[in-house]
Regions:
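Contiguous segments within soluble domain cores/interaction surfaces
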Residues: 1-28, 112-202
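Small/polar beta-strand repeat architecture
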Residues: 28-115, 128
Length: 202
């Protein structure tokens, strides 16, 4: 997938934390065997393989047409953040299916492939402008430790401590997050602007 764009905010004097999930093609499909009529909805798909917190779309489910993505491939707004209840069940907290038509059969949980993070390191630089002066860096290097990779959960966690954000003197910048493979291949996966706001409570 191409680099995603997201604008971030830091509150000075507060801990900044953001969890990134690196998605890639191809899509994966897991057959559905049951969908509850409840809020939140629970979907059963044996051995779904979906990491907790991953985005999923429901497609081609029989009976409960209301839950299906309308477009193929699904649009970003048709994906829902999934809570992994077990290896066979997922909860979609955003979806209340209590008033939907009863599920009959078929359908798939569709989701992007989670990238294998083994062998990767990560780095993120905040600059005053594109190609400008570095304001702050985040890396997976132990001495820095502001980025943590979890290949089991398939997460990339960015953290800036409250102590460090309190020292921020700039108000706005730009950033990019790069993943570096063991072979030295660099992939930019996220970029955007970042704003540092003054805290209200000290």
């Amino acid at each position: 997938m191409s680099c995603e764009t997201e604008d971030l905010e830091i509150l000075k004097g507060k801990t900044f934390s953001r969890v990134i999930r690196w998605e890639s093609t191809p899509f994966l499909y897991k057959a559905i065997t049951a969908i509850t009529k409840a809020g939140p909805v629970v979907v059963t798909a044996t051995g779904h393989g979906v990491p907790d917190g991953w985005r999923v779309a429901i497609v081609s489910a029989g009976g409960m047409r209301e839950i299906n993505a309308k477009y193929s491939p699904p649009r970003p707004s048709e994906f829902h953040r999934a809570k992994k209840l077990s290896s066979d069940t997922l909860e979609l907290n955003e979806v209340n299916s209590a008033g939907f038509t009863t599920y009959t059969s078929g359908g798939y949980v569709q989701y992007y492939t989670p990238v294998d993070l083994s062998g990767y390191s990560a780095r993120m630089t905040i600059r005053d402008q594109v190609g400008g002066t570095s304001l702050l860096s985040l890396t997976t290097v132990v001495e820095n430790g502001r980025i943590v990779l979890d290949n089991t959960a398939k997460t990339i966690t960015l953290t800036i401590s409250a102590t460090d954000t309190a020292l921020v003197t700039w108000s706005e910048g730009v950033y990019d997050l790069e993943m570096v493979s063991s072979g030295g291949v660099v992939t930019e996966i996220l970029a955007g602007t970042i704003t540092a706001l003054d805290e209200v409570t000290t």
